[in-house]
Every structure is written in structure tokens, then in C-alpha cells.
Amino acid sequence: MSDINIKIGLAEMLKGGVIMDVVNAEQAEIAQQAGAVAVMALERVPADIRKDGGIARMSDPKLIKEIMSVVSIPVMAKARIGHFVEAQILESLGVDFIDESEVLTPADELNHIDKDSFKVPFVCGCTNLGEALRRIGEGAALIRTKGEAGTGNIVEAVRQLRQVNKDINYIKNADKSELMAIAKNLQAPYDLVTYVHKNGKLPVPNFSAGGVATPADAALMMQLGAESVFVGSGIFKSA
């Protein structure tokens, strides 16, 4: 049902830019005018989700449609981890990317969405290479760090990106005979570990998110190897 290469190609088009969290159509227009490569449609930014507590779900379809109607750049929206019906709703709305997001309250603590069964590309978060490769194995077309969304604190995003890069470098320089053991240790698909060994990078774009609060933070992540950054509530909330 899906062609992963087409999905990855769509994700590649977002490289070298900023993806901005927006909570209404006006913010979406401002983000587009300011040069954002995409917007993330949200009812509440992560900082407010943290502050308010309670259950965080997919955004109201009405809000997503309003945002889609005023911008020409890609529109992303978040679904809860494992909530494939929220993802089906988002796909039917015509969003350009779905972020299966840990910022929302998980619907399934054991299983992620089977992303290959959708035509729309998925974004997924990771804290290390094993997690990244498992999500790619499920059909993710774009990987990002999880960081600490809504805090304005960049430290976790930096740690995670450095860890992914370190793990990639280790696999790239490993002997071919070690790859099966590495795959088992990472709990990752063997073919994806082999890809990393041969190419020295993930098979999908590698972005950064979670606590990116200033232009300097965004530049830091890019210079550490992130191919784009998700700039969220941190940029408004950071003191």
C-alpha cells in the first residue's frame, strides 16, 4: 500500500529548514512567511500540555483543516503512539506528514502504528539508534530526536543526537561479522543495520526536536548533524 522511497523523498524535501509548531491559522501564516519548510498543527503546544496535565490527544480536525487552508507548505499533525485510528483520521484529512508522538498520551505502550499500511509518511522520535531503526522498520520515513519537548532545555536533544551519531559511527566501522550481534543487541532489523554499516547514516532523514528554544539552539543541532529542526513552544516560552 505504501512506497517507502516516495515517502522518504517527501521527507528529504524538508532538509535544511525549520518545522514550526502552530496552534492556529494566523501562526501558520506567520511561520510560512518567516520561511518555515513545514508547520506542525497543534491545539496545545508541548509546554502547555506539560503544564496542564491530563490526557493529550490528536488535535481537532477543524483546527487542522483551518491551518491547511491558509498555507501552501506541508502541514504535519500528531497522533498518539499506537493509535492507528487517529492516524487514519489524519490521513483522511489530507495532512502531509503524521508524527507518531510521545508528546501526546500513548494509546498503546507496547506497539507502535504499522506505518507501512498508510500512504502518508510518518515522523517518529528516538533517543538512540536501536529505537530509530525499529521505527524505520515499522515504516517511518523521518526520524527526530525526542529531546525534552516544552521545556526550552536542549540538553536531551543534544545527548540523543550525539548518541545516534556515535552508534552510527560504531556500526560503520564494525566488522561485517559483528553486524548480526549488533542487530540483536539493538533489537533492530538486520537489513537496516547493514544499511548503516555500508552508508554511515540512517536510511531516512535525521532531524532534531525537543527543547529547541532559540536560533542558536537550532544552529547547534544542525552543526551536530541534524538535517532539520522542529522548533516548538520553547521558542515562545524560553525565558
Swiss-Prot record:
Associated pathway: Cofactor biosynthesis; pyridoxal 5'-phosphate biosynthesis
UniProt-listed Pfam families: SOR_SNZ
EC number: 4.3.3.6
Bilayer-crossing regions: none
Alphabetical UniProt keywords: Lyase, Pyridoxal phosphate, Schiff base
A GO BP entry: pyridoxine biosynthetic process
Keyword Lyase among UniProt keywords: yes
InterPro entries assigned: Aldolase_TIM (IPR013785), PdxS/SNZ (IPR001852), PdxS/SNZ_N (IPR033755), RibuloseP-bd_barrel (IPR011060)
Family: Belongs to the PdxS/SNZ family.
NCBIfam families cross-referenced by the UniProt entry: PRK04180.1
Function: Catalyzes the formation of pyridoxal 5'-phosphate from ribose 5-phosphate (RBP), glyceraldehyde 3-phosphate (G3P) and ammonia. The ammonia is provided by the PdxT subunit. Can also use ribulose 5-phosphate and dihydroxyacetone phosphate as substrates, resulting from enzyme-catalyzed isomerization of RBP and G3P, respectively.
Subunit-structure text: In the presence of PdxT, forms a dodecamer of heterodimers.
Protein name: Pyridoxal 5'-phosphate synthase subunit PdxS
Species the sequence originates in: Francisella tularensis
UniProt gene name: pdxS
